[in-house]
């Protein structure tokens, strides 16, 4: 009897699965908020230099006398006159406004608080020479996500999914709350890094715990549900950020609910599959019988015994012996080729994705509106992506998604700043293509790697995505050279990566490889068993989507 048969015996998709899946998925609403909350908590309002403390504005001719103008006729953000400049304003940077000696803002800045009453930028003056620190905060958060994926992924295999989830909920609640009360910028960054670590663990173990309690034929549906819940979280963030504009209050609001998640997570039932893989048949039996009672299948649960479990576990133990290490990806030429090509695709997708979603202020429209639009475009993008990869194939879908995304971003770099409608439309289209690229790369990676190293390959791909999300905020610092430089870089990387897809084989309609030998000889028709395996198992890999990237 296979493990899937055991799940069917204790109720399949019963009351227990419905309750636990709902409770495990619920925190993902706020996970999306944590990933991109810095668009609001680190927003940069309009600002200009504060006059000297001893300045007499009424005598000097008002604040305008201290502010030089830029080429657009707006007050300079990072310079002031060393002495007041009398006379009419000179919006074109001529005469007094163009010849007066200037100096940095040694007395601080005055911010326009009409949209954002308080952000980490205004509180700690992360502008001008300190502007790079704003992006550093987001990069450190992504470093935490990278570390969390490695640390908590390992701990979940050692300690169990439930225990690690409980720890992650508590860590997110505590670190997120502490970040809201951080007295200075370094401490804020430290707590954000810890939040990134724990949220990566939540994303990883949420998916694992849910699918390990679901029958095969429902796992793709659960994965799709998880993806759409994450997208819904992007809508939620826009509304919450609009209602709560103060950065400390917003940070607190998206963190405190994790205390509730921590409390109810104690009632989760540990994965019986994990118990069995750890050799704890007694705990496996106890968990299955408990689920049977909740699902109203008490009599079926009573029929289970240690002997039945041993028979079911035998195949899993045999498959477990065939697992390969990550080093196998580099030792074997065929796997090394896949690893290098797929790493480029993972990196490019995540790099460009976070380059777009973490620069909402750069499109010249309401930051709240574009947050909603960016969340909404995921819905049709995921649907269109699903249809394309199942009709035209994985390789052309992956190539088209990256190529179109890159072209849209590159075009955005040459569109004038005042054309906000065109720039926003291109950004939304590019973001939708990158969402489709995330869908495709999860699926494509799962189909390319053989069973013996499939999970390891997916894990390494996810790691490269984390690297892309870490580097992406740092690239935005190149705006100091020229405003469109980041967009040219964000666009060029996916365009270049799209060419890599021609080096990969097509997997549409092909049986899943179990060994490297299968990979090297992808020929022959699929057996009915292989067709079922591909139909239900592969979409599971795709369902993680960009939330793990995130």
Swiss-Prot record:
GO molecular function: alpha-ketoglutarate transmembrane transporter activity; antiporter activity; organic anion transmembrane transporter activity; prostaglandin transmembrane transporter activity; sodium-independent organic anion transmembrane transporter activity; solute:inorganic anion antiporter activity; xenobiotic transmembrane transporter activity
Membrane topology label: Multi-pass membrane protein
Record key words, sorted: Cell membrane, Glycoprotein, Membrane, Transmembrane, Transmembrane helix
Similarity remark: Belongs to the major facilitator (TC 2.A.1) superfamily. Organic cation transporter (TC 2.A.1.19) family.
Subcellular location(s) per record: Basolateral cell membrane; Basal cell membrane
Miscellaneous comment text of the record: Involved in the renal transport of a variety of drugs with well-known nephrotoxic potential, therefore may play a role in the etiology of the drug-associated nephrotoxicity. Uptakes the diagnostic agent PAH/para-aminohippurate and clinically used drugs. Mediates the bidirectional transport of PAH/para-aminohippurate.
PANTHER family membership: SOLUTE CARRIER FAMILY 22 MEMBER
Region (Disordered): 513-550
Extracellular side: 31-135, 188-190, 246-248, 359-368, 417-425, 478-484
Catalysis performed (reactions): (6R)-L-erythro-5,6,7,8-tetrahydrobiopterin(out) + a dicarboxylate(in) = (6R)-L-erythro-5,6,7,8-tetrahydrobiopterin(in) + a dicarboxylate(out); L-erythro-7,8-dihydrobiopterin(out) + a dicarboxylate(in) = L-erythro-7,8-dihydrobiopterin(in) + a dicarboxylate(out); L-sepiapterin(out) + a dicarboxylate(in) = L-sepiapterin(in) + a dicarboxylate(out); prostaglandin F2alpha(out) + a dicarboxylate(in) = prostaglandin F2alpha(in) + a dicarboxylate(out)
Tissue distribution of the protein: Expressed in kidney; in the basolateral membrane of the proximal tubule.
Domain topic, free-text comment: Multiple cysteine residues are necessary for proper targeting to the plasma membrane.
Source organism (scientific name): Macaca fascicularis
CDD domains in the record: MFS_SLC22A6_OAT1_like
Posttranslational modification: Glycosylated. Glycosylation is necessary for proper targeting of the transporter to the plasma membrane.
Annotated GO biological process: alpha-ketoglutarate transport; monoatomic anion transport; organic anion transport; prostaglandin transport; renal tubular secretion
InterPro entries in alphabetical order: MFS_dom, MFS_sugar_transport-like, MFS_trans_sf, Orgcat_transp/SVOP
Identification of the protein by name: Solute carrier family 22 member 6
One of the record's GO cellular component terms: basolateral plasma membrane
Gene name for this UniProt entry: SLC22A6
Lineage: Eukaryota, Metazoa, Chordata, Craniata, Vertebrata
